[in-house]
């Protein structure tokens, strides 16, 4: 893949920011992430965020869908699939959905996987492909001849996986496809029954120039800064030069654990005073809150957390617990209940149940 012209030599410096106070930083962060109620449609939202992280855990709904719901409210989840697999306005790479305009940048990251051995995972992929050249040829030939294919439609012709390299499941066909995917040789062409369909990249992704790895990394830093709105600098905050301050309504919504507003836990604590950890891998007896707890955003403040569980067979959204932050306004209960009701409606739940663990100040509103 050719490098973009004019990108050799010294890469441009990172975009400078402007100093802002903490209150303005919070407003800009919420507005930049479209959590102020201004999001309009799925594609524009993904473009503004830069990417969507994929996670299949569906205690409520998959993370990518909850992230969009937090901004858009009720929306048709089929629209995301349409944008990916029909309109091809989005593409999937490395467990993220990217706007197609970002393909030159992502190809710079693919180049790094092909050329670099700096990180352990990069060395693992290089060694795995070197040891399994014949297996690699077989997979690429089968995709060329019969693709797109599910991973189970390919034979495991590997030499075996060394225990110390166990990295991505236990099936070597999946390991091979993932390795080739990271390097840009194969791509995800769609889904069948929730499973990925694999094909040769040239049959899925359009021809584009590839950025150098260095330029891709620089542009991604700038894109992340723009999407987040603010970053920490020298003990304070600075805003992206394109970020605009403004009022944020007291809109209440629930956030996925993978939401970019709180994905960096240290940043979330510094900006919102909110200490948050996902506890699904913590033994039940050691959990402080619950298995899959969602932060509650009200305006520019994170006022608490809540553990909703969608019981699909029963058609019930159950709130296993809710916890208010010490600074949460006493009148927050109705807004939290409204957010839960909106979530239930979007999920298609027929009713809402509330468990015993809720803040006293919110109890009447949450219990209806």
Spell out what each predicted region is:
Residues 1-368:
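Long, charged, low-complexity, helical-prone intrinsically disordered regions
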């Amino acid at each position: 893949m050719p490098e973009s012209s004019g990108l050799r030599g010294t890469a441009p410096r990172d975009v400078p920011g402007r100093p802002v106070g903490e209150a303005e930083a919070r407003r800009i962060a919420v507005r930049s992430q479209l959590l102020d109620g201004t999001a309009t449609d799925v594609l524009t939202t993904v473009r503004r965020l830069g990417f969507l992280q994929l996670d299949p855990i569906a205690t409520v709904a998959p993370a990518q869908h909850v992230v969009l719901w937090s901004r858009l409210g009720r929306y048709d989840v089929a629209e995301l699939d349409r944008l990916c697999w029909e309109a091809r306005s989005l593409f999937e790479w490395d467990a993220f959905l990217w706007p197609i305009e970002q393909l030159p940048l992502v190809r710079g990251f693919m180049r790094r996987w092909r050329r670099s051995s700096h990180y352990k995972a990069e060395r693992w992929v290089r060694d795995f492909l070197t040891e399994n050249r014949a297996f690699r040829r077989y997979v690429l030939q089968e995709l060329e001849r019969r693709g797109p294919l599910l991973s189970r439609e390919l034979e495991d012709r590997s030499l075996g996986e060394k225990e110390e390299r166990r990295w991505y499941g236990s099936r070597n066909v999946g390991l091979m496809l993932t390795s080739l995917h990271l390097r840009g040789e194969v791509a995800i062409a769609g889904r069948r029954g929730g499973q990925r369909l694999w094909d040769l990249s040239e049959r899925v992704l359009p021809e584009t120039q590839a950025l150098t790895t260095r330029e891709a990394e620089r542009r991604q830093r700038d894109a992340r800064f723009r999407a987040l709105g603010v970053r920490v600098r020298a003990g304070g905050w600075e805003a992206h030069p394109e970020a605009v301050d403004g009022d944020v309504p007291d809109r209440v919504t629930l956030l996925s654990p993978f939401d970019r507003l709180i994905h960096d836990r240290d940043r979330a604590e510094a900006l919102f005073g909110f200490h948050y950890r996902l506890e699904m891998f913590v033994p039940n007896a050691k959990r402080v809150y619950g298995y899959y707890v969602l932060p509650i955003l009200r305006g520019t403040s994170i006022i608490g957390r809540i553990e909703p569980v969608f019981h699909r067979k029963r058609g019930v959204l159950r709130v296993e617990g809710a916890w208010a932050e010490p600074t949460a306004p006493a009148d927050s209960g109705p807004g939290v209940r409204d957010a839960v009701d909106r979530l239930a409606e979007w999920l298609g739940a027929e009713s809402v149940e509330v468990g015993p663990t809720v803040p006293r100040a919110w109890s009447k509103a949450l219990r209806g």
